[in-house]
């Protein structure tokens, strides 16, 4: 499961996904990591899609110290609806994370190389 993703052409991708994109230019991102803020697409109450910024990761509402907790960044499609951590978000709080690549860091000694 990958812990980094890329969004190399955010303006084109988000304009295609969201009718409410305000047109503000966004810079390409090649190393989006957990806990970083990135653009996503959400549906408003009337169903129109809007681009908003959200922090990557899901911290359970039962966490005692959210500021020092590691967020969940992966879920298995075959069990996501059964897990307490994801169940309510899957039903009521969905979003589209615009990405055009994902990768993990491959480590060899002290050197790290991104592997797609």
Protein language model regions, located:
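Short linear sequence motif anchored by a di-proline
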Residues: 1-116
């Amino acid at each position: 499961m990958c812990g980094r993703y890329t969004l190399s052409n955010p303006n084109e991708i988000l304009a295609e996904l969201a009718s409410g994109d305000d047109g503000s230019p966004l810079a390409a991102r090649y190393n989006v990591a957990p806990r970083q803020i990135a653009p996503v697409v959400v549906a408003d109450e009337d169903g129109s899609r809007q681009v908003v910024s959200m922090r990557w990761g899901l911290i359970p509402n039962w966490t005692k110290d959210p500021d020092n907790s590691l967020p969940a960044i992966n879920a298995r499609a075959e069990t996501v609806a059964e897990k307490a951590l994801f169940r309510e978000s899957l039903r009521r709080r969905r979003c589209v994370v615009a990405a055009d690549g994902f990768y993990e860091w491959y480590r060899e000694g002290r050197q790290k190389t991104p592997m797609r």
